[in-house]
A protein has these predicted regions:
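Clamp-loader machinery-focused feature within the broader ASCE/P-loop NTPase space
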Residues: 1-124, 279
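Conserved adenine-binding aromatic site and its adjacent loop/helix in ATP-hydrolyzing domains
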Residues: 99, 131, 154, 158
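Conserved catalytic/switch belt of AAA+ P-loop NTPases
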Residues: 102, 127-144
Length: 327
């Protein structure tokens, strides 16, 4: 079982949460925000166990309620997710959950409502939840978990205690991964890709590491506009990898910008030679322009522009920078 002490890099806020729930002095709603993989869900689970625990040191992890929380079978813990086949949490799902809140707890203790992807609530669902947060039931605690707090109504945020989680430094993340059994070489690569988020680093598989090399080879080989189409065609049909493609490229660009600004070299970051050439050839201004182009590509995708069109704008910008700065 993970413990509060295992949530490294969050000592101050975790200490406060542990204190509140061990003493039963918690508030009715918490908003846990921060990048994915920083421990938000683990913290919510630990707080849930502490709120329901019957042991002396909360959470003990051994009593019946703690074990039921860990196994996902506690009758007073409810998780709100979209209906099967849907991406959005609608008002129907929210009303059904709130109906359970009105019923007496099964184990004569607290009731816990977990909303692990709170940004997926539509406006109607959020307004429905807001009414309950304005007049919260006794002995009920809500955990809204999200990496996109701006997607929530300000009135919902104002009725929650906001707890912000932060990534570790890459060095601290690397040490944690080594402690968890990763090789030093793999830990270094994963810590950089995950930007210090331990949970995210643990989810990185060989496919993502291979993509890092493959993508930086193909993308930074686009020296002329005519080269762009072939690279677009490599990824346009693979919808599962498209977000990963943009995320991986953004991390690579971030590292390149650091080198262009006089910081650490990208030579040992697991990128293809072509990315190293770009970092050495194009000045900081070009890297910043490319990062802005990538940001606009993400906006295009959010506006339902086809991935091929959005990705092509990035590739064409790369070829334009090469044209400006020939060898």
């Amino acid at each position: 079982m993970i413990a509060f002490a295992d949530l490294e890099g969050q000592s101050a806020l975790i200490g406060q949460l542990q204190h509140d729930f061990a003493r039963g002095s918690y508030v009715h709603a918490y908003l846990l925000t921060g990048p994915g993989g920083t421990g938000k869900r683990s913290a919510a689970q630990l707080c849930t166990m502490a709120a329901l625990c019957r042991g002396e040191h909360k959470p003990c992890g051994a009593c019946g309620p703690c074990r039921r929380v860990l196994s996902g079978t506690h009758p007073d813990v409810h998780t709100v997710v979209p209906e099967k086949g849907k991406q959005i949490i609608g008002v129907g799902v929210m009303r059904e959950m709130l109906d359970t809140v009105a019923v007496k707890s099964f184990e004569d203790g607290a009731k816990v409502i977990l909303i692990p992807q709170a940004e997926r609530m539509n406006a109607a669902a959020q307004n429905c939840l807001l009414k309950t947060l304005e007049e919260p039931p006794e002995r009920t605690v809500f955990f809204l978990i999200t990496d996109q707090p701006a997607a929530l109504l300000p009135t919902i945020v104002s009725r929650c205690r906001v707890v912000r989680f932060h990534p570790l430094t890459e060095e601290a993340c690397q040490k944690r991964l080594i402690a968890l059994g990763q090789s030093p070489e793999m830990a270094k690569k994963k810590a950089r890709i995950a930007e210090g988020c331990v949970g995210r680093a643990l989810e990185i598989d060989d496919d993502q590491l291979d993509l890092r090399m493959e993508l930086t080879h193909s993308v930074f080989s686009v020296h002329h506009p005519a080269d762009a189409l072939g690279v677009v065609n490599m990824y346009k049909e693979d919808k599962e990898r498209q977000k990963l493609v943009l995320d991986t490229l953004e991390i690579a660009l971030r590292d390149i910008l650091v080198q262009q600004a006089g910081g650490a070299s990208v030579a040992d970051a697991g990128y293809a030679r072509e990315a190293l050439d770009y970092a050495s050839r194009v000045p900081l201004s070009g890297g910043l322009t490319l990062m802005e182009t990538l940001r606009r590509a993400r906006v295009m995708l959010a506006s339902n522009v086809a991935f091929a069109s959005a990705f092509e704008t990035v590739l064409l910008q790369i070829s334009e920078e090469y044209a400006k700065w020939p060898w």
